[in-house]
């Protein structure tokens, strides 16, 4: 029947897509590249800056290929290009566009660090810096991460006035709560002591009343000694 044949073909097609997805999923999640948490970094003109980059692979790597690229509004270029033979080898640089660039990373001891430093910064160095990694052991799967560098004349001082005010208010509130708690405990202690004194006073007063009224157990009930 045509309907049953079409349904069978559709099932086979979806099964094939599912198997392909399961095959590609480990690859897509294995190789990762990171340039840190900060997506933008600032540096002063004329100084040196470290552009961080690390990678990780669940399947290991052999003859890993890495490179850094620079991209601005009107310029794109490869800054440095190199390879890493294996996990016991340090990266080797094959191409370097600028003498101001130095490879600072190491891949030994599972550091997987391919960071670079850029000396004598210029305002024209402002732009996007992307760290690329391609792993032949994972069917040449490639991953990259980008960080934006902003070269400035001087770093702006962060105004912490608001932060200090907030911390002062929070500290004051906490101090006030502690003070109130201590006062509350002190008052409770005084009340407890006062109640204990009142109780002792009532017991003592009750004993005196019994003595004066000649009640059982009082001194008035005691008989005088018999004269012989």
From Swiss-Prot:
Entry keywords, A to Z: Cell membrane, Disulfide bond, Glycoprotein, Immunoglobulin domain, Ion transport, Membrane, Signal, Sodium, Sodium transport, Transmembrane, Transmembrane helix, Transport
Protein's UniProt keywords contain Membrane: yes
Predominant place of localization: membrane
GO molecular function: sodium channel regulator activity; transmembrane transporter binding; voltage-gated sodium channel activity involved in cardiac muscle cell action potential
Keyword RNA-binding appears in the UniProt entry: no
Transmembrane segments: 163-183
Pfam families in UniProt: V-set (PF07686)
InterPro entries in UniProt: Ig-like_dom, Ig-like_dom_sf, Ig-like_fold, Ig_sub, Ig_V-set, Myelin_P0-rel
One cellular-component annotation, GO: plasma membrane
Signal peptide positions (record): 1-30
Post-translational modifications reported in the UniProt record: Contains an interchain disulfide bond with SCN2A.
Name of this protein: Sodium channel regulatory subunit beta-4
Organism listed in the record: Bos taurus
Name of the coding gene: SCN4B
